[in-house]
Swiss-Prot record:
One of its GO terms (cellular component) is mitochondrial matrix. The lineage of its organism: Eukaryota, Metazoa, Chordata, Craniata, Vertebrata. It is an enzyme of class 1 (oxidoreductase). It is found in: Mitochondrion matrix. This is Pyridine nucleotide-disulfide oxidoreductase domain-containing protein 2.
Length: 581
């Protein structure tokens, strides 16, 4: 195995082409001067838009800036032989209607469900020769209770009730994801007909209220309170509380003590895969295979997808209606509608002529909170990490915990808060929160034989360092070394196993994937930027102040994650408008 690692290191150094290109240039035919609809950006939401509109008979073209489709849902061979889900790395939130409507299995989508799904190893200094404890959670409730009982018998008894409580809340929120938010603009200043139509947008909200019933005040607290307050009402053991709290802060520049952090937790528990509520899994072939399946569904019905075609400007006619886009090379492409999968900031502050948008609207867009705590590190290793709390098997084959989200520096909610406080001072966390995943444990072809791809989703790292200092190569390497040192404490030998690494700080995530501030949700999933306030109040229904322009990415309702709901909802809104044009 070690010899294999040395050979791989030589290959990495010698490779002139470190990226696995999945080009879709001119998929669906050559560039035409006019389409019914143009989509800016081939992220998963943009591809979902194209697939739905094309199925509805709307001739659609997608223009992508990069050489590869998928936005943040991509597979790239950054290190020769190692195929990484370079940004997004897990699947759960994709709406079930999209699986079936777009026939994604028919178009090649294959999943690896994870069970167990969560592993939190302890360090427990002073344990002598004893193996440190760990917390392993999966779909077997009785086994979960045994695991939790190591830390608290009371928590073990309560855990099933907590899971049922959260499941009920997720069930109530679910209908809100698949429809445009309540149309407040129509209620306030629409015609009588518009006001009557807008009443239909109340149905999902009323349905949610019926499901929650008399428990509504308690559920309201979950959405508005700090997650520590919520978890303290249920549990006493820190390893369990900290493990659950990681889902409340992941991707968010917030502490577990921040009011409203409970919603982000809910956002990450309301998914499911293949009928299993709350299940998370790996896409076979990496996240890019999901984007490929959606693209295949779109192009099979006639959509056109173009890579390395950057949209420079949204075109507007003299009457204030969208009439297409201009590409970076000067090519004009006409269309009746334009749907933007890019962030609200890029869409409205860079691509759209400012004179056609209200000043107040532009000001609100410029004020969106896009702070990001995330640095993603993709690592190629020549063997599986062996954790002190769960040593490897003699032959090094994957064990159940290797398929999990492995939570490091997460034994106590205080550790999460301290990591956050460092970033508030402009410093990368001294002891970063780390979610370590090894997708090749279930999908071996992602790496050479005996080797593995490791995803390190870490926080907190500010966009700008203390004193206004920008990230440079030295700072990036120093932070990655710190993360590796942390992993080494839990899994000795990890650093020696490393073949290569790809470090993506917040500025890197912004530059490569167009994520403003490096924010994986396009803008924060805080209560003031959700539902009918996403991206801004009175413009949450995918339509924009400019007729014919729609927002269909993560900056629109219901927000970030590989969900596809924003794309699906926006496609239906645009289609209804097209029918009346």
């Amino acid at each position: 195995m070690a010899a294999s690692g040395r050979g791989l290191r030589k290959a990495v150094a010698a490779s002139p082409f470190p990226a696995w290109r999945r080009a879709h240039t001119e998929a669906g035919g050559g560039l035409k001067p006019e389409y019914d609809a143009v989509v800016i950006g081939a992220g998963h939401n943009g591809l979902v838009v194209a697939a739905y509109l094309q199925r509805l008979g709307v001739n659609t073209a997608v223009f992508e800036r990069r050489h590869v489709i998928g936005g943040a849902a991509v597979t790239e061979e950054i290190i020769p032989g190692f195929k990484f889900s370079r940004a997004s790395y897990l699947l759960s939130l994709l709406r079930p209607q999209i699986y079936t409507d777009l026939e994604l299995k028919k178009h090649g989508l294959r999943l690896h469900l994870r069970n167990p799904y969560s592993f939190t190893p302890m360090l427990e200094e002073g344990a002598g020769s004893k193996v440190p404890r760990s917390l392993l959670l999966g779909t077997d409730m009785a086994e979960n209770q045994k695991q939790i009982a190591q830390f608290s018998r009371k928590d073990a008894q309560v855990f099933p009730r907590y899971e049922e409580f959260m499941h009920r809340l997720a069930l109530a929120i679910d209908p809100l994801l698949d429809a445009a938010p309540v149309d407040m603009a129509a209620f306030q200043r629409g015609s009588l007909l518009q006001r009557m139509r807008s009443f239909s947008t109340l149905k999902p909200l009323l349905k949610a209220g019926r499901i929650l019933g008399a428990q509504l005040p308690r559920y309201y607290e979950v959405l508005t309170a700090p997650i520590t307050k919520v978890l303290d009402q249920w549990f006493e053991s820190e390893p369990l509380k900290a493990t659950l709290a990681t889902d409340a802060v992941i991707g968010a520049m917030t502490s577990p003590h921040t009011p409203g952090s409970g919603y982000v937790l809910l956002h990450h528990v309301m998914g499911g895969l293949e009928g299993m509520q709350g299940a998370w899994g790996y896409v076979q072939g990496g996240m890019g295979a999901l984007s490929d399946a959606i693209a295949s569904s779109a192009t099979t019905h006639g959509a056109s997808i173009f890579t390395e075609k950057t949209v420079a400007k949204v075109q507007v006619n003299s009457e204030g209606c969208v009439q297409g886009v201009v590409l970076e090379d000067g090519t004009e492409v006409r269309s009746k509608v334009v749907l933007s999968n890019t962030s609200p900031q890029i869409t409205f502050l860079k691509l759209t002529p400012q004179e056609w948008l209200p000043e107040e609207f532009l000001e609100r867009i410029s004020q969106l909170d896009t702070r990001s705590p995330v640095t993603k590190i993709n690592v190629a290793v020549d063997r599986l990490p062996s954790f002190l709390a769960a040593p490897n098997a003699p032959r090094g084959q994957p064990l159940p915990h290797h398929q999990c989200s492995i939570h490091l520096n997460c034994e106590d909610t205080l550790l999460l808060h301290q990591a956050f406080e460092d970033a508030m001072d402009g410093l990368p966390s001294h002891r970063p929160i780390i979610e370590l995943c090894i997708p090749s444990s279930l999908d071996p072809p992602l790496a050479p034989s005996g080797c593995h791809v490791v995803s390190l989703f870490t926080q907190y790292t500010p966009y700008t360092l203390a004193g206004g200092k920008a990230w440079d190569e030295q700072e990036r390497d120093a932070y990655a070394d710190r993360v590796f040192d942390c992993v080494e404490v839990y899994a000795p030998g990890f650093k020696d196993s490393v073949v290569g690494r790809d470090i993506l700080t917040p500025p890197d995530l912004e530059r490569i994937f167009g994520l403003p501030g490096g924010n994986i949700f396009h803008c924060a999933m805080s209560l003031d930027q959700l539902y009918f306030a996403r991206p801004v109040p009175l413009h949450s229904g995918y339509r924009c102040p400019l007729q014919g322009l729609y927002l269909c990415g993560s900056g629109a309702h219901p927000g970030g994650g590989v969900m596809g709901a924003a794309g699906r909802n926006a496609a239906h809104v645009a289609f209804r408008d097209l029918k009346s044009m």
